[in-house]
């Protein structure tokens, strides 16, 4: 709403899937040092009514609007890709800024995976908690010639874990080595609206999930980290 409409768009003759296009005429877009998307132009608002403090927080010192989104530019044409929200940015112990959304989205594309929580704030590396899709699990087991099992049993099954480790490897291909998932755990229960771990719009309540599974997160960092692979098969396991 602060931009009074779109700032970028994919055109019929200039489209890149996965991006929000290039800047529209009259709108300029740049990235801050931490990757936050900054915009300014004829459609950008000038401030909040009778709220100078909020207005000051919304803009940089040189007048660019802070969107709160993290992104990157692709190609010579400058296609903009949004990778996450600044407030969700994870800063590792080594000072690396990691947007969890790209990793979480790629992992949720695996048929076994229901929900993902990427963690790593002030930790030596990035980790993840995965939950299993109870509806897809029987189909996956059958297609892989495995016996029926409950979600709880599947979360402990080494064959299921091996498939998920490959999925983690594929997700890691989208990010740098420093941003890659090096440790993960499969939870025996899913995140749902009913148990308070998903919002009504089905987004993970990150703070609540981190609090409820604090012991599991601590345990992630007591094991030998995975070594990111560059030879993972592109097929779904």
Per-region residue spans from a language model:
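Beta-strand->loop->alpha-helix junctions that form or flank phosphate-binding loops
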Residues: 1-2, 21, 118-119
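Conserved A3 ("GATE") glycine/threonine-rich loop of ANL adenylate-forming enzymes
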Residues: 1-11, 24-26, 98, 124-125
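Conserved ATP-binding/catalytic segment of the ANL
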Residues: 23-92, 109
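Adenylate-forming
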Residues: 1-3, 42, 44, 48-49, 79-108, 128, 137-157, 177-179, ...
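Conserved C-terminal "lid"/linker of ANL adenylate-forming enzymes
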Residues: 115-117, 124, 165, 169-237
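C-terminal boundary motif of the adenylate-forming
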Residues: 70, 110-136
């Amino acid at each position: 709403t602060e931009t009074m409409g779109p700032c970028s768009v994919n055109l019929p003759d200039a489209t890149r899937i996965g991006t929000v296009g290039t800047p529209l005429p009259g709108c300029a877009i740049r990235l801050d040092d931490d990757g936050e998307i900054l915009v300014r132009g004829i459609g950008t608002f000038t401030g909040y009514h009778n709220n100078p403090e909020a207005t000051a927080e919304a803009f940089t010192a040189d007048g660019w609007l802070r969107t709160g989104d993290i992104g990157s530019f692709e190609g010579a044409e400058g296609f903009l890709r949004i990778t996450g929200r600044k407030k969700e940015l994870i800063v590792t112990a080594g000072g690396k800024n990691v947007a969890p959304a790209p990793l979480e989205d790629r992992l949720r594309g695996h048929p076994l995976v229901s929900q993902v929580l990427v963690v790593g704030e002030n930790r030596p590396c990035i980790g993840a908690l995965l939950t299993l899709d109870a509806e897809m699990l029987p189909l996956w087991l059958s297609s892989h010639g495995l016996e029926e099992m409950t979600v709880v049993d599947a979360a402990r099954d080494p064959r299921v874990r091996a498939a998920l480790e490959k999925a983690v490897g594929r997700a890691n291909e989208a990010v740098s080595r420093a941003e890659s998932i090096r440790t993960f755990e499969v939870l025996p229960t899913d995140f749902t609206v009913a148990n308070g771990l998903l919002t009504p719009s089905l987004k993970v309540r990150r703070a609540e999930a981190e609090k409820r599974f604090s012991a599991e997160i601590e345990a992630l960092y007591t094991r030998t980290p995975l070594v990111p692979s560059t030879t993972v098969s592109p097929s779904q396991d």
